[in-house]
From Swiss-Prot:
Keywords assigned: DNA damage, DNA recombination, DNA repair, Nucleus, Transcription, Transcription regulation
Domain of life, per lineage: Eukaryota
One Pfam family cited in the UniProt record for this chain: zf-C3Hc3H
Region annotated Disordered, chain positions: 1-39, 183-203, 274-324, 473-523, 627-675
Family annotation (InterPro entries): Potential_DNA-bd
Functional note: Putative regulatory component of the chromatin remodeling INO80 complex which is involved in transcriptional regulation, DNA replication and probably DNA repair.
Family: Belongs to the INO80D family.
Cell compartments where the protein resides: Nucleus
Higher taxonomy: Eukaryota, Amoebozoa, Evosea, Eumycetozoa, Dictyostelia
Protein's name according to its UniProt entry: INO80 complex subunit D
Secretion signal, residue range per the UniProt entry: none
The keyword Cell inner membrane is annotated on this UniProt entry: no
UniProt biased composition (Low complexity): 282-318, 482-519, 634-648
An individual GO BP term: DNA recombination
Length: 675
């Protein structure tokens, strides 16, 4: 035993010697540091920023730029102006006008490390914790006011199956005591609630509250001062998992301070009612106190003379009679008011019935007018008045954004940052994010408006163009029929007058028919039903006076370009092609371009693939080549002239055949354009 004790003593002595050596070493190191600081103290006092000639080992330089000089960890942020530290580590600078946030968490019992300026009032909190405290205050006060105004809407009673034998609860009024933990202030008006435990199997409810609201002290929109004392509870508050999604969203927005709270409007509406109730209660209390004081005085005083007693009794009787008469008058007034209200309701019902009948009549008239005006031209719908007023109201409504636009309009971004003296990078990014979200919503609305406007204008153009074309076609058919009838009548008259000269008359009739056909073609070209090029009998393209094969003759067109395939030294294909086409070749010459390997080999792979894809697409989409119309017409005309000189008897049959051939050619050309 003695040996063991000696060994322990020796070990303790060795440990003490080691600790003393470490202490001496640390003190020597500390002395060296203090000397270095004293030597360089002049540079620190003159300016907060360290000069480049300082002897302190500062590792805050990187690529010729100064960074934060924090000793706790390597910080890559730049320091503030006239200081050596960034915003997060500015508290390491003793001369900086900042102090630490006074917020202490209830769970970890640690203090917040964010800096706060000295100019702010006590208690000093950073922006985030200040907002948390304000939002919690609002929520607690709203819940208290709601429980006062509507006790049925308070937290529901628990079921017996969900409550255990031992259960504790905190009322919604206890949340006011938790605010003192945030702010550090203790109000004398508030009293902590006590919780009790019960061992009974069945739950028992003991709910006694004494609430004294000083509403007369409210100035403007200030919050009411509450003095609360709640007795014990023995049941748990059960969270409602079956809440509506809107309520859940509003709770989340309350935490972030975006909305004004669930009971904010109810609080405003019920302020007047609460004031009136409070005044009535005070009046009743004063009356009771006055009556009690009178009773006490009567008991204390000696018995007066019978005359005085009779006088008092008479006065009391008179007062009672007056009260009875006043009550009767009040009842009569109430009855009269009820009768008046009933009469007003009956009148309103009659007026509503009359209005409904008038509306029905107006609707019937509108339906009849709409039926009459269905065939009217739609050009009036695009006047200046319609575009300025009705389109903006009805047609150019923005798409549904899930109520994001309302949130952005109601949301005040300066609410967070108005009272803050310094902003971190995260807060600055948050502010910019809000502004960008507003811009995105504006651009979406504008895009939808332009899109709907283009749709309406396109429909209007199509409807007007179709109606005009139908009218023109009907008018032209009538004119052509009249001309044909006149020509036939003239020919019959000539035949009857000149029976002797059959040969000459037949020749004249043939010439007249040819001239009439040419006149018809010229008229149709002038009216815009045929292409303006010579000897072309094809319908023109939309918004132009030329067909597809002769579209290059139109000087105003800007979509088409000629094919660049060289047929000979000085000639090109010249067939119209879209300018977007790559390569600039028509459908027939694309195959030749594919087979010409010498040109394609010199190109890179990606360009080859792109050209092949374009060629395949254009083969499917390119319009088919048009049938030349001029050659067969000229040939038929020559045959007609030769046959007329040889055989006069067979001229009528040949002319009919030639006319039928010309009509078939026109139909073929029209079908090719339509395809």
């Amino acid at each position: 035993m003695n040996n063991n004790s000696n060994n322990n003593n020796n070990n303790n002595i060795d440990q003490k010697n080691e600790t003393t050596n470490e202490i001496t070493n640390n003190t020597s190191n500390n002395n060296n540091i203090i000397n270095n600081v004293n030597q360089n103290s002049t540079s620190i006092t003159t300016s907060p920023i360290l000069s480049p000639n300082n002897n302190i080992n500062d590792n805050s330089m990187m690529d010729g730029k100064r960074l934060c000089a924090s000793s706790k960890k390597v910080c890559s942020k730049r320091p503030m102006e006239t200081y050596r530290f960034c915003i997060k580590h500015i508290l390491e600078e003793p001369s900086a006008p900042f102090k630490q946030c006074e917020f202490i968490s209830l769970k970890s019992q640690k203090q917040c490390t964010n800096p706060v300026s000295i100019k702010e009032k006590d208690p000093r909190f950073c922006v985030s914790h200040k907002h948390i405290i304000e939002s919690t205050k609002k929520r607690v006060l709203e819940s208290v006011v709601s429980s006062i105004t509507s006790p049925s809407s308070s937290s529901p009673l628990p079921n017996a199956s969900l409550i255990g034998s031992n259960s504790n609860i905190t009322s919604p009024l206890q949340n006011l005591t938790t605010l003192n933990a945030f702010t550090g202030n203790n109000n004398n008006n508030t009293t902590t609630t006590t919780t009790t435990t019960t061992t009974n199997s069945t739950p028992s409810l003991n709910f006694d509250q004494q609430i004294n609201i000083d509403i007369d002290n409210i100035n403007g929109g200030d919050e009411p001062n509450l003095s609360l004392s709640a007795s014990s509870f023995n049941f748990n508050i059960i969270s409602n998992n079956d809440e509506e999604p809107k309520k859940k969203i509003m709770k989340i927005l309350d935490r972030h301070g975006i909305s004004q709270g669930r009971f904010y409007q109810d609080f405003k509406q019920n302020l007047k009612q609460l004031k009136q109730k409070h005044k009535q209660k005070q009046q009743l209390q004063n009356q009771k106190m006055f009556e009690q004081s009178q009773q006490q005085d009567q008991q204390q005083k000696p018995v007066q003379q019978p005359i005085q007693q009779q006088q008092q009794q008479d006065q009391l009787q008179i007062q009672e009679e007056r009260q009875v008469s006043q009550q009767d008058e009040i009842l009569e007034k109430q009855q009269q008011q009820q009768q008046q209200q009933q009469q007003q309701q009956q009148q309103q019902q009659q007026q509503q019935q009359q209005q409904q009948q008038q509306k029905k009549q107006q609707q019937e008239l509108q339906i009849e007018n709409n039926k009459e005006n269905e065939n009217i031209n739609e050009s009036n719908y695009f006047g200046e008045e319609f575009i300025e007023k009705d389109l903006e109201i009805e047609l150019f409504k923005a798409m549904d954004d899930g109520h994001l636009s309302e949130l952005c309009e109601d949301f005040d971004s300066d609410f967070y940052f108005a009272s803050s003296s310094v902003l971190t990078d995260e807060e600055l990014i948050q502010r910019r994010k809000i502004y960008i979200s507003k811009l995105i919503l504006l651009y979406k609305k504008q895009y939808n408006r332009f899109k709907e406007r283009l749709r309406i204008i396109r429909r209007h153009y199509i409807s007007t163009s179709l109606s005009l074309n139908q009218q023109n076609d009907s008018n032209k058919m009538e004119i052509d029929n009249n001309n044909d009838n006149n020509i036939n009548n003239n020919n019959n008259n000539n035949n009857n007058n000149n029976n002797n000269n059959n040969n000459n008359n037949n020749n004249n009739n043939n010439n007249n028919n040819n001239n009439n056909n040419n006149n018809k073609l010229n008229k149709r070209k002038e009216e815009g039903n045929l292409c303006l090029s010579v000897n072309c009998k094809v319908k023109p393209m939309l918004l132009s006076k030329y067909c597809y094969s002769h579209i290059l003759q139109d000087k105003d067109q800007k979509l088409f370009h000629e094919c660049t395939y060289q047929l000979s030294a000085n000639k090109k294909c010249g067939y119209p092609i879209l300018k977007v086409q790559i390569p600039t070749l028509c459908r027939e010459h694309l195959d030749i371009y594919e087979t010409n390997n010498e040109i394609i080999k010199s190109l890179p792979k990606k360009q080859k693939q792109f050209i092949k894809q374009r060629i395949d697409i254009e083969k499917h989409n390119a319009p088919s080549t048009l049938v030349p119309v001029t050659q067969p017409i000229n040939q038929n005309n020559q045959n007609n002239n030769n046959n007329n000189t040889n055989n006069s008897s067979k001229e009528e049959s040949k002319d009919n055949n030639n006319n039928n051939n010309n009509k078939e050619i026109l139909k073929d050309s029209d079908n090719t354009m339509i395809s």
